[in-house]
């Protein structure tokens, strides 16, 4: 996943040459950020199969990216089911019970895990490459033949409620939920991946709906099988056809509501005195695109203005010591999301002053060109960070999964990074003026006051 300033998703510009196989597509440019060939194979049922050979003798990482997340939960009363299936997918099938699945998986040397975001659910494992066929058998079986009783469903629903209760005892989780609800009035980004609490409480009564959700979304056209490591595209494609070829395409498409334009600053406050005072500024940002300069320019801006090397950080955290931490960045999302600035305070009374300093920093970046040397250094540092993080099959697969969730195409990583080198001082001023407006701002605060300090 993308961090605040994309520190884990930037990379060094490396040269890669690609050869094409008759059954796959590759792009054959020499200016790609990822130094390994990406082979794609589209099956007749709509399943996308991606192979990235990597020098990791005896190891392979298998990821399945299901492009279904909280974003797709458009029906009232049943939020949280994308995350719920992250749990249910380990319940077993007629062929492999939960215990048999775990035992078979253990024989591959792999451990399976999963996670959910607003835009996708991802399942992943890394094991012995000579056991890849068994991994395919296990994964195809549960994706095509998942089976669970109503009792098992209710048991897992109770576990999800417990997870929510534990997570949202944290004030930061509470303000995240409140900020989402406040910033988005119509779009499904208004609820977290956990879902609304009332829906989670009612989840045990939604057994029939759970089967409908699985039938709608656990279909080949929503999924990408990604394999990275000591493999060949010929072998991976053959296994995909063998084990996923019978998977039937579905017909359901969710219609995600469009968020109307925000026209005034919104405020939300959480009264809590158990943590240091906190506030955030969330501006409406763009949807992810691998063809627009906006997101790369915002990422570079975030590093220059809000990172730990920025002038603002040095002043507020190091010199004046009135702020514990400050960071900021845009979220990668399929639909327009948020650029959020997070501030942890030393004293709540200094919130108005710190807000004013942030506004001054934004005003400067709107009006003045950033230093040319700083701009080039920032772009290089961001790209170098990526290069340091793609040294295992799992880390490469995780990076590619991020872009598959956004566009369905792993080559987006290469197209995006071609844009990073093109970011100019004028682009940074442009996005600052375009997105950092009071009408598109949501301010969230935490303090022991009944009312927020900043409203």
Please place each PLM-identified region on the residue numbering.
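Cleaved targeting-peptide boundary
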Residues: 23-31
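Mature N-terminal segment immediately following signal peptide/propeptide cleavage
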Residues: 31-63
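Short, solvent-exposed loop/turn elements at domain surfaces
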Residues: 49-52, 58-61, 70-74, 289-290, ...
């Amino acid at each position: 996943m993308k961090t605040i300033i994309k520190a884990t998703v930037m990379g060094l510009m490396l040269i890669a040459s690609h050869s094409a196989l008759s059954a796959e597509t590759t792009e054959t440019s020499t200016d790609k950020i990822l130094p390994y060939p990406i082979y794609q194979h589209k099956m007749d049922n709509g399943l996308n199969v991606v192979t990235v050979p990597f020098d990791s003798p005896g190891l392979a990482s298998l990821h399945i990216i299901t492009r279904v997340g909280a974003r797709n939960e458009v029906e009232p009363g049943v939020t949280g089911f994308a995350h719920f299936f992250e749990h249910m997918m380990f319940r077993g099938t007629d062929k492999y019970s939960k215990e048999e699945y775990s035992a078979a998986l253990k024989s591959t040397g792999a451990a399976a895990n999963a996670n959910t975001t607003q835009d996708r659910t991802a399942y992943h494992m890394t094991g012995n490459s000579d056991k890849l066929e068994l991994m395919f058998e296990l994964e195809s079986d549960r994706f095509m033949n998942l089976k669970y009783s109503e009792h098992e469903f209710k048991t897992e629903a109770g576990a999800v409620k417990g997870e929510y209760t534990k997570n949202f005892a944290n004030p930061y989780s509470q303000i995240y939920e409140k900020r989402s609800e406040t910033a988005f009035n119509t779009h499904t980004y208004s609820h977290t991946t956990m879902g609304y609490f009332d829906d989670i409480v009612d989840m045990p009564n939604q057994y029939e709906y759970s089967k409908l959700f699985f039938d709608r979304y656990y279909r080949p056209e929503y999924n990408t099988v990604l394999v990275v490591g000591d493999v060949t595209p010929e072998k991976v494609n053959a296994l995909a056809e063998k084990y996923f070829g019978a998977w039937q395409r579905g017909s359901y498409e969710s219609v995600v509501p469009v968020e109307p334009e925000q026209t005034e600053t919104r405020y939300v406050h959480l009264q809590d005195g158990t943590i240091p005072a906190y506030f955030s500024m969330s501006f409406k940002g763009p949807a992810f695109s691998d063809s627009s300069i906006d997101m790369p320019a915002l990422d570079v801006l975030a590093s220059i203005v809000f990172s730990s090397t920025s002038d603002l950080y040095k002043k507020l955290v190091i010199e004046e010591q009135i702020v514990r931490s400050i960071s900021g960045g845009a979220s990668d999302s399929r639909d327009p999301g948020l650029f959020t600035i997070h501030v942890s305070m030393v004293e709540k009374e200094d919130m108005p002053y710190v807000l004013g300093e942030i506004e001054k920093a934004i005003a400067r970046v709107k009006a003045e060109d950033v230093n040319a040397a700083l701009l080039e250094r920032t772009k290089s540092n961001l790209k170098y960070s990526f290069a340091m993080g793609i040294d295992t099959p799992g880390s490469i697969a995780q990076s590619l999964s991020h872009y598959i969730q956004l566009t369905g195409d792993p080559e987006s990583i290469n197209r995006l990074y071609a844009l990073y080198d093109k970011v100019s001082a004028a682009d940074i001023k442009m996005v600052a003026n375009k997105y950092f407006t009071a009408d598109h701002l949501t301010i969230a605060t935490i303090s022991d006051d009944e009312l927020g300090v900043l409203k």
